[in-house]
Design a protein with these regions (language model features):
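Mid-to-C-terminal alpha-helical segments outside catalytic/metal-binding sites
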Residues: 2-37, 50-120, 149-157, 178-181, ...
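Short glycine-enriched loops at secondary-structure junctions
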Residues: 126-127, 170, 231-236, 349-352
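Catalytic pocket-lining loop regions of alpha/beta-barrel enzymes
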Residues: 3-8, 161-162, 168, 178-337, ...
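Active-site loop-helix segments enriched in His/Asp/Glu that coordinate
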Residues: 115-117, 128-160, 173-185, 207-210
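Active-site metal-binding loops of divalent metal-dependent hydrolases
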Residues: 43-44, 348-349
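Divalent metal-dependent hydrolysis catalytic cores, especially in the metallo-beta-lactamase
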Residues: 38, 90-99, 111-134, 161-167, ...
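Alpha-helical scaffold segments that form or flank carboxylate-/histidine-based iron centers
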Residues: 33-41, 138, 168-171, 175, ...
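Residue-level preference for long, well-ordered alpha-helices that form the structural scaffold
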Residues: 102, 136, 140-147, 172, ...
């Protein structure tokens, strides 16, 4: 007797660009208990307004990055010179025309997410990340502060549906305190910390695990907000003539391991035990292998290490960390290794790799993997705990 094929997570045919998709949650039962609030732990939002030029003081307007709409995408950079080029701009054109993709139509955003079965979201930036390493550190901080004000306004307009991710000064302690204090006063609950920190004001590469950076971590720890890291900073090491966008997506998670190692082997978590860290959009299947490899590295190189980790490798994960995923059946099969309280479902709206348009299938897969009661935590409870919100 032949067995029937396993149901697929993906709709039949080509899924297509997000701007051409629509939600179908009302037509499908996920198996979640009635009344479950689905909270996507990782979505993205484009800035539609020319916020930096509008909000910079007159004497600095000539240094403000501009934002404009062109050929289906919101671009930014000096006037007419987009910093968003190549595959990055091509990808933006896949979704920026969605009614709710940008900050100028929060009502449409809430509606599109609801049609896809999503009640609430944590919204990360899109093209603004191209400004992460603006060469003028003072202008960079001003950019971040303007963005924080803007995303806080979006959060307010969403009436509890959208929680914005802020940006902070990570290169000096006073700036970290300044931006964290302001970010908290705006009602933001977390911030994005780049995995590649770039250079300090003197042009020296920043080492997150250095003694000099400890004062910045002190400020982050004192603020009490969780740290988020996101894929997307790793670039292919050599060009691809064919399907470069797919190759780039496959290496996106590369930098997680380096930062993960800094937290453990670099002593960051030993010196700052109050930190909480989330890893976003990289899935969860990477976690067991990273833990296993870290245990082997520690056993093999302990005699050479200047800093001796104070705890078992897995305790750092269990105490401080969690991760988000969209479609990760392999990771869900390893849930006992990872921890049911350490994983957070997301739709990643409105990206190409998002489940937007078929999120009900992904949610049902979570229920099938862990059961309805545990699924409630995975699809909403864990991200609310991470952010420290109860509503």
């Amino acid at each position: 007797m032949m067995s029937s094929p396993a149901p697929t997570l993906y709709p039949e045919g080509v899924i297509g660009a997000p701007k051409d998709r629509r939600g179908h949650a009302a037509e499908f039962s996920t198996g979640l208990p009635a009344g479950t609030e689905v909270f996507s732990a990782d979505n993205h939002i484009s800035v539609a307004d020319d916020i930096f030029y509008e909000r910079f003081p007159d004497e600095l307007k000539d240094q403000a990055p501009r934002i404009w709409y062109e050929d289906g995408a919101y671009l930014l950079g000096p006037p007419g010179q987009s910093m968003v080029v190549g595959d990055f701009s091509a990808v933006l054109m896949q979704y920026d025309d969605l009614a709710g993709a940008a900050t100028n139509n929060v009502e449409a955003r809430v509606r599109e997410l609801a049609e896809d079965g999503v009640d609430k979201e944590l919204a990360f930036p899109n093209a603004v990340l191209a400004l992460f390493h603006h060469p003028d550190h003072a202008i960079r901080e001003r950019i971040f502060r303007v963005y924080n004000e803007h995303i806080a306004e979006v959060q307010e307009r969403s009436s509890g549906h959208c929680y914005g991710v802020g940006l902070i000064n990570w290169w000096d302690p006073a700036g970290a305190r300044r931006t964290l204090t302001e970010l908290k006063s705006l009602g933001l609950t977390t911030f994005l910390m780049p995995i590649s920190p770039g250079n300090d004001r003197d042009g020296r590469p920043i080492d997150y695990s250095s003694a000099e950076m400890s004062a910045v971590w002190d400020e982050i720890e004192a603020a009490g907000l969780p740290v988020t890291h996101h894929i997307g900073e790793s670039q292919p090491k050599f060009p691809s003539e064919v399907n470069s966008v797919a190759v780039a997506m496959m290496v996106n998670i590369d930098s997680f391991r380096e930062m993960f190692s800094k937290y453990i082997f670099g002593g960051i978590l030993d010196r700052h035990p109050g930190l909480r860290v989330g890893w976003f959009e990289g899935g969860i299947a990477w976690v067991p292998t990273a833990l296993q490899d870290a245990e082997h590295v520690l056993a093999s190189y302990r005699h050479m290490l200047a800093h001796q980790p104070k705890r078992d490798v897995r305790d750092y994960w269990d105490t401080h960390m969690c991760a988000s995923f969209m479609v990760d059946p392999l990771g869900l099969r390893q849930i006992d290794e990872i921890g049911i309280d350490k994983v957070m479902w997301s739709s990643d709206y409105p990206h190409n790799e998002s489940t937007f348009g078929y999120s009900e299938r992904s949610l049902a897969a979570v229920v099938d993997a862990v059961g309805p009661e545990d699924a409630v935590r995975v699809v909403g409870g864990n991200i609310k705990k991470f952010l420290g919100i109860s509503a």
